[in-house]
Amino acid sequence: MSDQRSIFDVHGPVQRHDTKDGSTTLFSENFQQYYHNPNGALSESELVFFSSNGLNQRIQASNGPIHIFEMGFGTGLNFLLAAHKMIEADNSHALHFYSVEAYPITSELANGFTYPITWAKPELNTWLPEVFSGLNQGWNTFQPDPSWPIYLHLYVGYLKEIQTQMKLNHPIDYYFHDAFSVEQNPECWTDDVFMSYHNWGHAESILSTYAAASRIRAAMAAADWKVFKAPGALGKREMTLACHPNSKAQPVNLTPCPNERLKNRWFGGEWN
């Protein structure tokens, strides 16, 4: 392991860590947290952001463009995995992947990442170092391979900076909420954040996160999301999925959270 300081990072170094499934993650010394589950970065990403929310089936169906918004670009694994799945499925529709990252890592650090996967295109191995090598504050847009309609729209800065000015050509289909925990990063887990998601999406949008605390579920419910418990990844008992109250995409095999009670607890000031 070696410390690497980000070009924008004022929060101290990060360390490379090999997780138990053979994939790379990082450990933030400032937040005192891993970027992914140390039991398996790739495995966690697959379950939380592609399997549990039905995105794998949507990609395989190849029935239109897909728009994803991610809070916390981190190592870029979720973008890389989404691109891989689109190419592997020979899905010729566009993928627009929006993400926010306040403290991007260096391209040198990204160049050392390893994953136990055979990428759909070998060039995928070079995409992340290329992304991290050319970042500016604000919006950065990349099309890593002109032969595929795969676009990364990466905002370097804080989510609050774009909440009131976000302009999209198409509503968001899937939300990947992958910020550091509510204990370490509470500003990313408020009803205001989840209301922005609500406004940027559509009736069938789906929100997924690795977290399961009552506080974050209450914030979602307060923003008019219908919240569900889902089995957690790699030793975690639960994770969280959410959809619009009248969505046709409501998961039928999951347990709904007590949404009204959570909403009342939030507005009652339990976490203020």
Where are these regions (language model features)?
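SAM/dcSAM-binding transferase cores
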Residues: 2-3, 12-17, 143-148, 238-272
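The AdoMet/dcAdoMet-binding core of the Class I SAM-like
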Residues: 55-170, 191, 223, 233-234, ...
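A short glycine-rich, Lys/Arg-flanked "PGG" loop and its adjoining helix->strand segment in the class I
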Residues: 187-204
